[in-house]
């Protein structure tokens, strides 16, 4: 079955509309969103509505949580954007729809398992907030701990940098693998990139198509709410990680094995980023830099 995995929309309606249209043109019926629907961008309400309408599974991102609670660890620009986003979702002129949006955000799980696949926003260790950057392949201790929590394949977002991490301390950017990767016996973590705020030097919107070799009848679904996590303090020194926030999952249940090859395809799509930029410029609470960076994909 073919599924689309999207992440890090960040209130960028122009990018999201292009991605949804491309997914539809591919004949794909199921879309999974890995979080951060909002934050940074000028259209938070519209993006939430599109995700509600189109996505079968949606996970909680750190910016989604930041809108509901006090933002933690955000820089000044990101914090101002989140407070502005919260104001849009509290606007009394759209009270009924905003109540539905808050209810939707409040019910989002932090992780989802489907067959041999684990889906998170950040990492398998801390699904909300931990970053896994390409340069982390040189931090073997960190990577070993992360892969210990991956049964087979993990998909994530959060860094806005797409690519494939292997258990052998390698990272492959999409252009290095001709934008396609076939999964084998080894464990991998795959970053699906960002729809609305790419940061790999390519300003085009990014998402992933997963051809998973499973039929709908073979798939076991499991979304795990925050309350079922247990906190542990097992991170070692020098990992650039706060042990007080580390989270570990219960051992994954046995899942169906794919009956065919599993392929991942990275899709890059141009969109009218200038329209998004001008919207950002027109909102005083949003830093102009949030628009400028869309031109460079940084």
Task: State what each model feature region is.
Residues 1-54:
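N-terminal active-site segment of His-dependent metallophosphoesterases
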Residues 1-4, 112-119, 183-188, 260-262:
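Beta-strand-turn-beta hairpins that frame and shape the catalytic cleft
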Residues 139-154, 159-180, 185-189:
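Anionic-ligand binding region
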Residues 167-298:
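Acidic, His/Gly-rich catalytic cores of divalent-metal-dependent hydrolytic chemistry
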Residues 47, 53-117, 126, 130-150:
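Active-site neighborhood of divalent metal-dependent phosphoester bond hydrolases
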Residues 6-7, 31-36, 40, 57-62, ...:
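Active-site neighborhood of phospho(di)ester-bond hydrolases with catalytic His/Asp-centered motifs
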Residues 10-15, 39-41, 65-68, 125-127, ...:
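Active-site environment of divalent metal-dependent phosphoester hydrolases
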Residues 23-28, 148-150, 209:
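Glycine-rich phosphate-binding loop signature in dinucleotide/nucleotide-binding domains
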